[in-house]
Amino acid sequence: MTDNAIPGPLDPEELQIQYAKSFLLQTDNSGLSLYEHLSALLSRILSERPPNALEVFESLSAELHWSRLKQGSDVLRAPREESHTCRKAEVQRALFSRGDGEGEESEAEGEMTESPLPNLLDLAHLLQQGGVNLGRDEAVRISLALKRLTDTHPLQVCHFWGKILGSGGSYLVAEVQFREGEDDEAEEGGEEEEKGEVEDDVEEEENEEAEDLPPKSTYRPPPVIPKEENGTGANKHVYYVCSEAGAEWVRLPPVTPAQISAARKIRHLFTGNLDAPVITYPPFPGTEINLLRAQIARISAGTHVSPLGYYQFGEEEGEEEEEGAVRDTYEENPDFEGIPVSELVESLSNWVHHVQHILPQGRCVWVNTSVKSEEEEDEEEAEEEEKEEENEPEPEVGPPLLTPLSEDAEIGQTPPWTAFLSTHLIPHYALAVLRSNLWPGAYTVSSAKKFENIYIGWGLKYMPEGYSPPAPPAPQAEYPSGPEITESTDPTVEEEQALKAAKEEAEAAAEEMEEEEDEEEEEEDD
């Protein structure tokens, strides 16, 4: 007999246990069996010993399932993108938060000093009656954004200028004035510009001394028109913009005459990115932030109006006014009693411009660019000076401040302004609404003694005939023309024959003269 005895038959209970265990050991597509899962689950319960094991049994089982999930390397899973609404709410959340004690301090300061913060809710209500709906929710958010601007900068005046739309985003524009002597950014910008100009001049001089330059071109570019100083002309106000309420306010740089002149020749939709390049013809000298500032200056000069008599020139300023000088300041009239709404709608003579007109030169005050320094005059020749004196430009003159709207030029056959009542059903409480047809999106809403200017549009001027880019300039002469390089024209056959006959006659006459002289000499010898 062998040692390996044949096992006897199993007990029925043990056999059922084996069958049950083999059933639990069956695996699915993931390679995991129920036996292994229950073993791991029971081991975790015994190790953690939660007080409510029955209640957390299902949650622990689900956690084990999720922990075993393995994502294949060949499966691409796109990350979950945050919605635009969530991003916008995250940006605007800071507007509605208030630190401990900040509210009480701001209220106490508001009682002591007047705040430059405008009442935007009142403005939105006034505009809504005039048919320009800014929206109550957006008005609240913009008001909170303006409050943040006034809290972080020493402002004397803050005004909501409007909203410029763009293809990829819009701009909220705030028009501000700093307290006297507290605009440090403007002074720093001016110093940097002066340093840059000095460095450029030094580099040019060094390059000229170091290298033998080829002959200089006789072409002289037009003189650079200087920009107006901060606080005057087109740079009278400072502008801040942000992409949406809650975003950071960005200060726009001062505008230059070259940028205004170029903006008049192009049409470009804003993208919502201040650093985006402006690719147009004619080329624009700057990026979108400069184009935005130029368009704001143009829109303000053409659409900011007020009822006649609301503003007046100062008495002291009128006495000291020099002949030919341009008035650029005014003050509110304390004796203004208001103009009835019906009269504001009937005649445009009851409205005036209270922002200076921008001349074709790109400035509000004309500057003579033909006046040159003594060094430049010494270098130039007398003939060139005489030519320049003959071609001296004529001064540009625009309409003065507080000019009535009735003197505005028409756009083809379209009037520049349209005035109407906000409602004809209840005329006693109606408002006067003035809409600009030259700059679509510019509105002025006025009651008897109160008015508001706002612009909500694409920043494009109306052109009835459509836009066509200007033609390129005429090609310049490659070299100066003169008799030294001018080719003579070939003579005709008749001219050649006449010249030949004239030469033959001259030769015959010369021979006769020689013969006569020879005969006279022979006679004298005899």
UniProtKB/Swiss-Prot annotation:
It is found in: Cytoplasm, Cytoskeleton, Flagellum axoneme. GO terms for cellular component: motile cilium; radial spoke head. Residues 180-231, 371-411, 469-526 are annotated as: Disordered. It comes from the Eukaryota. Functions as part of radial spoke complexes in the axoneme of sperm flagella that play an important part in motility. The triple radial spokes (RS1, RS2 and RS3) are required to modulate beating of the sperm flagellum. Belongs to the flagellar radial spoke RSP4/6 family. This is Radial spoke head protein 6 homolog A. It comes from Xenopus tropicalis.
